[in-house]
């Protein structure tokens, strides 16, 4: 699924990859429903993280939203297209391996060579990371450490955030505007 603001771009991008396949890509005009708890018969477990609950595609919009999905997604480090994910994002830098977004056993796919090389021959030097924020900072604010640019704050929900960081500089105390920033995960 894709946000309505991203649908045309996604349809155009998928059209580039269909090559000679007899496939028509159209807008399904369905609405995403999501929830926590048991998965309904017409739904499926969100594959990105067990705590993200379930999703279903239905004809009418959801009217019973009770979960702050943005806060949950940011706390779980689930990047979203148009916010943390841009057209030039490398999927491993976006932590796609952790959210079941890439399979190294699959055959051919666009970007496979670059992705495999990044996985097997190098250590990531930069990418998305979960951060704790003490204070308020606007999204897009530069994050600094020891007077050097360490990254950019991309999202904030409460005291959690998602930032794009240079991992070599994001090892200690950092700031974004007047807010104190601390890296939560240390996987890279």
For the regions a protein language model found, what residue spans apply to each?
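Acidic, low-complexity central loop/insert segments
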Residues: 1-79, 145
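Generic marker of residues within folded, mature protein domains
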Residues: 15, 46, 64, 108, ...
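Short, charged, solvent-exposed linker or helix-capping segments at domain edges/interfaces
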Residues: 63, 85, 174-175
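Glycine-rich, small/acidic residue-mixed loop/short-helix segments
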Residues: 94-102, 116-188
């Amino acid at each position: 699924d894709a946000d309505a603001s991203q649908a045309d771009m996604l349809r155009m991008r998928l059209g580039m990859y269909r090559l000679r396949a007899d496939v028509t890509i159209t807008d399904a005009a369905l609405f995403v429903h999501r929830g926590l708890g048991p998965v309904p018969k017409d739904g499926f477990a969100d594959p990105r993280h067990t705590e993200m609950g379930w999703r279903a595609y239905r004809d009418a919009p959801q009217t019973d939203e009770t979960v702050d999905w943005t806060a949950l997604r940011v706390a779980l480090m689930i990047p979203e297209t148009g916010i943390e994910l841009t057209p030039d994002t490398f999927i491993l830098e976006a932590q796609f391996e952790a959210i079941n977004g890439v399979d190294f056993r699959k055959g051919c796919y666009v970007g496979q060579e670059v992705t495999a090389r990044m996985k097997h021959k190098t250590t990531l030097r930069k990418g998305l990371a979960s951060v704790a924020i003490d204070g308020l900072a606007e999204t897009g604010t530069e994050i600094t450490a020891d007077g050097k640019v360490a990254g950019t704050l991309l999202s904030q929900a409460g005291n959690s955030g998602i930032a794009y960081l240079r991992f070599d500089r994001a090892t200690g105390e950092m700031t974004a505007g007047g807010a104190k920033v601390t890296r939560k995960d240390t996987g890279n």
